[in-house]
From Swiss-Prot:
Induction: By auxin, pathogens and heavy metal ions. The keyword Manganese applies. It catalyses: oxalate + O2 + 2 H(+) = H2O2 + 2 CO2. Residues 1-23 form the signal peptide. Its EC number is 1.2.3.4. GO terms for molecular function: manganese ion binding; oxalate oxidase activity. Keywords: Apoplast, Cell wall, Cytoplasm, Disulfide bond, Glycoprotein, Manganese, Metal-binding, Oxidoreductase, Secreted, Signal. This is Oxalate oxidase GF-2.8.
Length: 224
């Protein structure tokens, strides 16, 4: 009986601790682990480390976000990523950043970061930021026009978007609590997957005719 109580208590404690343990990237076990992006070793969480003698002296600094991206794109926006693939020094540290630039009327389409919470600051202009709650929170849209110097927060896994409502260019910088937050662009995922989602699945799910689905697929055949 005593053993059973101990086992139940132990399982309960594990359940309480599990969300905290799985909430972000694993904790690092050394000060620096500069990613060996050319390494052949298979990695599960993070990359293998370069010897510090080969890491150089610039792995703690980057100027990649200093320059605006080219917003002459179908979405009228440009994302400059600064994750572990672009900044190997972030390996095992559980952080990354992006810069997003917007032309007037440009958008960062509805998307999801499956592995990270996001916090951002608008650097220039005015952006409509929208966050979609899950079904159990009423599928509610939380939105606000966020101006230069103001911030926003997006919980991990929630769909969200940004749209430049101003008449001038806009930009924002966002940070993630993961070295590789991942991204799922909803329109591209639905209509540009490889191989494609069968049209009957989408016609039933979206309650539209097949010709509408085929039209949307043609828009995303070449990606974003």
């Amino acid at each position: 009986m005593g053993y059973s109580k101990t086992l139940v208590a132990g399982l309960f404690a594990m359940l309480l601790l599990a969300p905290a343990v799985l909430a972000t990237d694993p904790d690092p076990l050394q000060d620096f682990c500069v990613a060996d992006l050319d390494g052949k070793a298979v990695s599960v969480n993070g990359h293998t480390c370069k010897p510090m003698s080969e890491a150089g002296d610039d792995f703690l600094f980057s100027s990649k976000l200093a320059k605006a991206g080219n917003t002459s794109t179908p979405n009228g926006s440009a994302v400059t990523e600064l994750d572990v693939a672009e900044w190997p020094g972030t390996n095992t540290l559980g952080v990354s950043m992006n810069r997003v630039d917007f032309a007037p009327g440009g958008t960062n389409p509805p998307h999801i970061h499956p592995r990270a919470t996001e916090i951002g600051i608008v650097m220039k202009g005015e952006l409509l930021v929208g966050i979609l709650g899950s079904l159990d929170s009423g599928n509610k849209l939380y939105s606000r026009v966020v101006r230069a110097g103001e911030t926003f927060l997006i919980p991990r896994g929630l769909m969200h978007f940004q749209f430049n409502v101003g008449k001038t260019e806009a930009s924002m910088v966002v940070s993630f609590n993961s070295q590789n937050p991942g991204i799922v662009f909803v329109p591209l995922t639905l209509f540009g997957s490889n191989p494609p989602i069968p049209t009957p699945v989408l016609t039933k799910a979206l309650r539209v005719e097949a010709r509408v689905v085929e039209l949307l697929k043609s828009k995303f055949a070449a990606g974003f």
